[in-house]
A protein has these predicted regions:
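C-terminal "capping" alpha-helix adjacent to the active site of nucleotide-linked donor transferases
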Residues: 148-166
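Nucleotide-sugar donor-binding catalytic core of glycosyltransferases
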Residues: 1-142
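A charged, aromatic-enriched C-terminal amphipathic alpha-helix characteristic of glycosyltransferases
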Residues: 161-190
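Catalytic phosphate/metal-binding cores of nucleic-acid and nucleotide-processing enzymes, i.e., regions
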Residues: 109, 153, 171
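Short, flexible helix/strand-to-coil boundary loops that buttress conserved ligand/catalytic motifs
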Residues: 140, 157, 171
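Conserved aromatic
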Residues: 115, 147-148
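Short, hydrophobic/aromatic alpha-helical segments in well-folded domains
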Residues: 78, 117, 156, 173-174
């Protein structure tokens, strides 16, 4: 489920649709709770994630974690609640250096892939800040704040957290954009 693949099929003349797997508004739903976490992340501890989170913590941006150091309690309600209580949820696109089975072992591959996390977060009524990936640029354009290194991430977090009006404007436009990818919207097209 990658928007880049969708475009490649369309270029070849095939009928194609981008169908995100993580876009069900009945699973990922906004729960009206107080935003008690400034910045959060849910997911596994891999690639550069720990380095970025540590850098934020060292610079007085506390990152609340779910499933990072232990097996996550992932059921849809707990995850929606966790996201809904956060002002910002981080998304990391970097898969890390990996050797693929078809490549020579001396060639390292570092992928910046599409993750469904931004859509999940937006459906819960929360803002996401994402590591850059080409797919996110296609889907969200300027509606999704992005970063390419830990310094940019810190700067973006500070800018958003220190300006409530800017935060609300950004969050509302991001959430509206995410709703365009919700299952019940694109099912009608198919």
């Amino acid at each position: 489920a990658c928007p880049i693949s969708n475009y490649r099929y369309l270029e070849k003349g095939y009928e194609s649709y981008f169908v995100p797997l993580e876009a069900n508004k009945y699973l990922f739903k906004k729960i009206d709770l107080q935003k008690k976490y400034d910045v959060s992340f849910f997911g596994a501890k891999k690639s550069t994630r720990e380095e970025y989170i540590k850098y934020l913590n060292e610079n007085k941006i506390n990152v609340n974690l779910m499933g990072f150091y232990n097996v996550p309690d992932y059921n849809w309600d707990n995850l929606s609640k966790f996201i809904s209580q956060s002002k910002i949820v981080l998304n990391f696109s970097n898969t890390g250096n990996k050797n693929k089975f078809y490549s020579h072992s001396t060639i390292k591959h570092n992928f910046f892939t599409f993750k469904g996390r931004p859509i999940m977060v937006g459906l819960c009524g929360t803002l996401c800040i994402s590591e850059f990936s080409p797919a996110n640029q296609i889907l969200f354009n300027n509606y999704l704040p992005t970063f390419k290194n830990k310094e940019e991430l810190l700067s973006e977090c500070k800018k958003i957290l220190n300006d409530e009006n800017y935060y609300n404007k950004l969050k509302n436009s991001f959430v509206e954009k995410c709703n365009e990818y919700e299952d019940h919207i694109y099912f009608k097209k198919i």
